[in-house]
Regions:
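Acidic/polar, glycine-rich intrinsically disordered N-terminal extensions of enzymes
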Residues: 1-64
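Glycine-rich, often proline-containing surface loops adjacent to acidic residues and nearby aromatics
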Residues: 122-125, 155-164
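Conserved small/polar residues in nucleotide/adenosyl-binding loops
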Residues: 250-253
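Extended, regular secondary-structure scaffolds
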Residues: 134, 162-237, 242
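Intrinsically disordered, low-complexity acidic Ser/Thr-rich regulatory segments
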Residues: 122-138
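Structured alpha-helical segments in the cores of large, soluble enzyme domains
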Residues: 85, 89, 134-156, 173-192
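Function-dense linear segments that define catalytic or interfacial modules
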Residues: 39-119
Length: 253
């Protein structure tokens, strides 16, 4: 508390004008997170996809790019917690379905090769390989929920982590979004007492041209509706129309 109050006073002294300070006192303006503005940035849209590509260095240790889906989940979790603990405010990982696509495909190919090597017929190979991939995706999101809701930052709080998803049309992108929603819907905790967790906050990117009736992602939309019905998650952003969000999203992508 003392540290926060000191930072607020230092910020007022060195970064605000007399007029701005007076406006704060009179309630005309409010500066969010004033106690942390001198030390670090506030809120971040983090490009995890680019960080993973080709490998990266973190904490004086080189991380190779993941070769399987379960490793990708572990590494992304490490990245998010490390980066989020070095800033204040929200930390968003956009389009996790797109990020996980290539690693899901790599795992799927490895699983197919594994079961073919056992001499199984092709139909069985495809069936059990896909079932294993579904389980791997489910366990990955369960791991995120445990990690992001139990590992606190050096400030003593839990990073406000948000992920977005919902626009990928490949089988792997769709699987990622659907499994993420199913994990959130099922909740965590003891049997008979499960409840949805807080983090990561899920934002569903809705596009009428992708999620409308008869469109390629209608089943993903239905999974989102079912999750909302039971948990009040995810939040929804519409990418359709001429509003601020669709225009901004189109510009960024």
């Amino acid at each position: 508390l003392i540290f926060n109050e000191l930072n607020k006073e230092l910020y007022k002294k060195f970064f605000l004008t007399v007029e701005e300070i007076q406006a704060i006192r009179e309630g005309y303006i409010y500066i969010h997170d004033m106690s942390a503005r001198r030390d670090t940035m506030n809120c971040c849209l983090f490009d995890v996809k680019n960080v993973l590509s080709g490998g990266f260095e973190m904490g004086n240790l080189w991380y190779n790019e993941p070769k399987t889906l379960d490793t990708a989940f572990d590494v992304i979790g490490d990245i998010v917690l490390s980066a989020a603990s070095q800033q204040y405010g929200g930390f968003t990982v956009p389009s996790v379905d797109e990020i996980l696509e290539p690693y899901a495909e790599k795992s799927h190919k490895k699983l197919i090769e594994k079961y073919r090597g056992l001499g199984l017929d092709e139909e069985t190979v495809q069936k059990v390989a896909w079932a294993d991939l579904e389980k791997e995706m489910e366990q990955g999101f369960q791991g995120w929920e445990y990690k992001f809701n139990s590992v606190s930052s050096s400030r003593g709080d839990y990073p406000f982590i948000t992920v977005t998803a919902g626009t990928r049309t490949s089988i792997y992108g769709k699987l990622a979004t659907i499994k993420m929603l199913e994990v959130r819907k099922n909740g965590q905790g003891k049997d008979g007492h499960k409840k949805p967790v807080l983090f990561p906050k899920i934002v569903f990117l809705y596009d009428e041209n992708l999620h409308g009736p008869g469109k390629p992602l209608e089943d993903v939309f239905e999974a989102g509706i079912e999750c909302s019905r039971k948990t009040m998650y995810p939040d929804w952003l519409s990418l359709t129309g001429d509003g601020y969000v669709p225009v901004s999203y189109t510009h960024l992508t």
